[in-house]
Amino acid sequence: MHNLSYASEEDTYTDTDFTPSGNSTNSTSYSPATIIGLAGLVSFLILFTIVGNVLVVIAVLTSRALKPPQNLFLVSLASADILVATLIIPFSLANELMGYWFFGEVWCNIYLALDVLFCTSSIVHLCAISLDRYWSVTQAVEYNLKRTPRRVKGMIVVVWLISAVISFPPLISMDRNTVDERRPMCQLNDHTWYILYSSIGSFFAPCVIMILVYIRIYQVAKTRTRNMSEKRRDPDGGSGTPRLENGLSREDSRRENGHCSSSPGERKPAEDNPDADLEDSSSSDEKAKRSQNETAPSKKDRRSSRKNSSSSKHSSRKSRASSKSLDLFSSRRKRRNTISRKKISQAREKRFTFVLAVVMGVFVVCWFPFFFSYSLYGICREPCAIPDPLFKFFFWIGYCNSSLNPVIYTIFNQDFRRAFQKILCKSWKRSF
């Protein structure tokens, strides 16, 4: 994030040489062994960050389970972390180990602007994701219909524009004085207004919004869970389905007890025996022809013929009633399947919301110490001094956050875990 220097009117410091008490050094104090160790450690951090976030991008773009458009936010967030690892951390490391800025004034200006932009965009992304979660919970049907890939991409563009508006204007007033032209420093001014502006705009304000939104999401989810549990306890709830099931069981019991003269084929003419009605009608026609060919039929025969025809009509009515009950049963079954799919989708949404809450919590934990000490220095300067090694630790812990999101996805989300395994297995097979 803010790879800044803190320059007062009397002194100027690089970010790595800053101490809130006002002490600074313009040359590196690291031994060769320490330089090698730090370079190796940070190089591993850079590589891990790039590989992990590239996996996130590939997983979202190729995995069917990760296709929902809201996951495009994670692609954009991972892209910001990749840019931090490639364009910011290497130059911060060189500045730390060398003790001065080696890469010229033009790149210094670009480097500072991008550093502020990428960290600001990370937290604004998380803020947008929290709002997306909130709308999907409170306006599930309407918002899910509106949440198309095109709309999400538009929201991502807005996130980057907001980040640029927060980050770039103060950079116009940067002080670029150097203590020694032979050892130039890449630095911003440390005026109180800028420190507070950047801290509030880039961290504290989005962080407060994000936390409040997630508290609201938790409240809504808790209320819904309580309402659902009350509905389950309600004896009148869902009485339609038991009645259908009882009706079917009564029909089955009547058939078993011999009360139904029709064959089992009557129960599902539409599904298993589509020609049942046709067979009934053809048999009745044959009976009619036989009765016409018989001469001088007796009264007994006529009575039996009427009984047969009434029995056939009764059987046909039963068949139609049974068909209707089966249609009703199949529609109920389809409805149950739809409900179960919705429950699976809701469970996935809950898991995803939990994962994003972990991502946001880790981000706050990683960056809060830096911004707190940075703001404290801007307000009260020397009286609020913290040890220089501690400030450097806070500074680099913030950068480490860029590598943690893929780890969080792997630990807490099964869809990401499967996607990562599939990608890595394919890469492994191709290499052999």
Swiss-Prot record:
<keyword id="KW-1015">Disulfide bond</keyword>
<dbReference type="InterPro" id="IPR000276">
    <property type="entry name" value="GPCR_Rhodpsn"/>
</dbReference>
<feature type="topological domain" description="Cytoplasmic">
    <location>
        <begin position="132"/>
        <end position="152"/>
    </location>
</feature>
<keyword id="KW-0297">G-protein coupled receptor</keyword>
<keyword id="KW-1133">Transmembrane helix</keyword>
<dbReference type="GO" id="GO:0030168">
    <property type="term" value="P:platelet activation"/>
</dbReference>
<feature type="compositionally biased region" description="Basic residues">
    <location>
        <begin position="331"/>
        <end position="342"/>
    </location>
</feature>
<feature type="transmembrane region" description="Helical; Name=5">
    <location>
        <begin position="192"/>
        <end position="215"/>
    </location>
</feature>
<dbReference type="Pfam" id="PF00001">
    <property type="entry name" value="7tm_1"/>
</dbReference>
<dbReference type="GO" id="GO:0004938">
    <property type="term" value="F:alpha2-adrenergic receptor activity"/>
</dbReference>
<feature type="topological domain" description="Cytoplasmic">
    <location>
        <begin position="216"/>
        <end position="351"/>
    </location>
</feature>
<feature type="region of interest" description="Disordered">
    <location>
        <begin position="1"/>
        <end position="28"/>
    </location>
</feature>
<keyword id="KW-0812">Transmembrane</keyword>
<feature type="disulfide bond">
    <location>
        <begin position="108"/>
        <end position="186"/>
    </location>
</feature>
<feature type="transmembrane region" description="Helical; Name=1">
    <location>
        <begin position="36"/>
        <end position="60"/>
    </location>
</feature>
<feature type="topological domain" description="Cytoplasmic">
    <location>
        <begin position="414"/>
        <end position="432"/>
    </location>
</feature>
<feature type="topological domain" description="Extracellular">
    <location>
        <begin position="176"/>
        <end position="191"/>
    </location>
</feature>
<dbReference type="InterPro" id="IPR000735">
    <property type="entry name" value="ADRA2C_rcpt"/>
</dbReference>
<dbReference type="GO" id="GO:0006940">
    <property type="term" value="P:regulation of smooth muscle contraction"/>
</dbReference>
<feature type="topological domain" description="Cytoplasmic">
    <location>
        <begin position="61"/>
        <end position="72"/>
    </location>
</feature>
<feature type="transmembrane region" description="Helical; Name=6">
    <location>
        <begin position="352"/>
        <end position="379"/>
    </location>
</feature>
<keyword id="KW-0675">Receptor</keyword>
<feature type="topological domain" description="Extracellular">
    <location>
        <begin position="1"/>
        <end position="35"/>
    </location>
</feature>
<feature type="topological domain" description="Extracellular">
    <location>
        <begin position="380"/>
        <end position="392"/>
    </location>
</feature>
<feature type="glycosylation site" description="N-linked (GlcNAc...) asparagine">
    <location>
        <position position="3"/>
    </location>
</feature>
<feature type="transmembrane region" description="Helical; Name=2">
    <location>
        <begin position="73"/>
        <end position="98"/>
    </location>
</feature>
<dbReference type="GO" id="GO:0019229">
    <property type="term" value="P:regulation of vasoconstriction"/>
</dbReference>
<feature type="compositionally biased region" description="Basic and acidic residues">
    <location>
        <begin position="227"/>
        <end position="236"/>
    </location>
</feature>
<keyword id="KW-0325">Glycoprotein</keyword>
<dbReference type="GO" id="GO:0071881">
    <property type="term" value="P:adenylate cyclase-inhibiting adrenergic receptor signaling pathway"/>
</dbReference>
<feature type="transmembrane region" description="Helical; Name=7">
    <location>
        <begin position="393"/>
        <end position="413"/>
    </location>
</feature>
<feature type="transmembrane region" description="Helical; Name=3">
    <location>
        <begin position="109"/>
        <end position="131"/>
    </location>
</feature>
<feature type="topological domain" description="Extracellular">
    <location>
        <begin position="99"/>
        <end position="108"/>
    </location>
</feature>
<keyword id="KW-0472">Membrane</keyword>
<feature type="site" description="Implicated in catechol agonist binding and receptor activation">
    <location>
        <position position="198"/>
    </location>
</feature>
<feature type="compositionally biased region" description="Polar residues">
    <location>
        <begin position="15"/>
        <end position="28"/>
    </location>
</feature>
<feature type="region of interest" description="Disordered">
    <location>
        <begin position="224"/>
        <end position="342"/>
    </location>
</feature>
<feature type="glycosylation site" description="N-linked (GlcNAc...) asparagine">
    <location>
        <position position="26"/>
    </location>
</feature>
<dbReference type="GO" id="GO:0005886">
    <property type="term" value="C:plasma membrane"/>
</dbReference>
<keyword id="KW-0807">Transducer</keyword>
<feature type="site" description="Implicated in ligand binding">
    <location>
        <position position="115"/>
    </location>
</feature>
<feature type="compositionally biased region" description="Acidic residues">
    <location>
        <begin position="272"/>
        <end position="283"/>
    </location>
</feature>
